[in-house]
Design a protein with these regions (language model features):
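Phosphate- and other anionic-substrate recognition elements at nucleic-acid/protein interfaces
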Residues: 1-180
């Protein structure tokens, strides 16, 4: 049986990118900030929980599946993150897991899996971020920041597994943006 529902992809962070739609469609997407820079984790958690309830626990917009990007492992970040950021990211994801429990199917994907799918190979963030944005624009997804672009790439990655018959149009082999 082919998947015919809607997928919500979340690049969970202080500024969370999201993408939503069914495989084969053009996703809707956006980004939202949870908390002020330097603000409390508790405030960010509360803002995240309110957003999930308001935007995604509504009958017309409920996803059939939610996929999120794994929080970055500190050793991979090469000292570019701190303990507060790690706690925030893990806390947001833990909240998401609890919120989805017995309500929504939840899946997880790593950054390297998504980049290999969407860009044809995994590469460092400084190279991958602008390429991901360019790839989204090439596909007609007018993203305005890297959070939205990462969420769209994650959405496309998950849709490929759900409906491989619809994935060829976004396969990196057909990308002009990736030919260099």
């Amino acid at each position: 049986v082919s998947f015919t529902g809607n997928v919500l992809a979340l690049d969970v962070a202080t500024v969370t990118g999201w993408a939503y739609g069914s495989p084969g469609s053009v996703p809707t997407f956006g980004s939202i900030r949870f908390g002020k820079p330097g603000g409390s984790r508790a405030a960010a958690y509360r803002a995240f929980s309110k957003w999930l309830e308001k935007e995604w626990n509504v009958r017309d917009a409920q996803p059939d599946l939610i996929v999120y990007e794994s929080p970055a492992v500190p050793s991979i970040m090469s000292g570019k993150t701190n303990i507060d950021t790690i706690r925030l990211l893990i806390g947001l994801v833990e909240y998401l897991e609890g919120w989805c429990y017995e309500n929504f199917e939840l899946r997880e994907a790593t950054v390297s899996q998504v980049r290999a799918h969407f860009l044809g190979r995994n590469m460092k963030s400084a190279i991958a971020k602008p390429m991901t944005m360019a790839r989204c624009v090439e596909l007609g997804w007018k993203v305005t920041n890297t959070d939205e672009a990462d969420a769209c790439a994650l959405w496309d990655y998950q849709c490929r597994f759900l409906r491989p018959d619809l994935a060829s149009k976004t396969a990196p082999i057909f990308s002009k943006a990736l030919i260099r």
